[in-house]
Amino acid sequence: MVRTNVVSFVLFAAIVLCIGSIQIDGQKHTAPWIPEDNSICCKEHPSVGRCLPNIDDSAEKGGKCWKFCIEGCETGGFCKLFGHKHICHCNCSG
């Protein structure tokens, strides 16, 4: 009986600690011991706003997603479909 209570308490404490370490801001979902990557590449950026394919991700048309991503990533970005809407996604450089 005591062993069951100890195991239950340890599992509960582990879950509480894991939940407390997550920042829900749409950008960071990593454990605190993993080094933070400040690069905008290989990530989605909903903060850029609505992304219209072939317009906002076009270099020729000066699209806002392309402009945002080209400053930090060599290959720019594109409008990536998530569910029923497109979000600006910066390409992975390299």
From Swiss-Prot:
Got any disulfides in this one, which pairs? 41-92, 51-79, 65-88, 69-90
Give the record's GO CC terms.
extracellular region
Q: Which UniProt keywords apply?
A: Antimicrobial, Disulfide bond, Fungicide, Plant defense, Secreted, Signal
Q: Which InterPro entries match?
A: Defensin-like_20-28 (IPR022618)
The record's subcellular locations are:
Secreted
Signal sequence span is 1-26
Organism ancestry: Eukaryota, Viridiplantae, Streptophyta, Embryophyta, Tracheophyta
Q: Which family does it belong to?
A: Belongs to the DEFL family.
Q: List the Pfam families hit by this protein, alphabetically.
A: Defensin_like
Please give a single GO biological process term from the UniProt record.
killing of cells of another organism
Task: Report whether Secreted shows up as a keyword of the record.
Answer: yes
Record protein name field: Defensin-like protein 21
Whose protein is this, by species? Arabidopsis thaliana (Mouse-ear cress)
Stretches of the chain forming a coiled coil according to its record: none
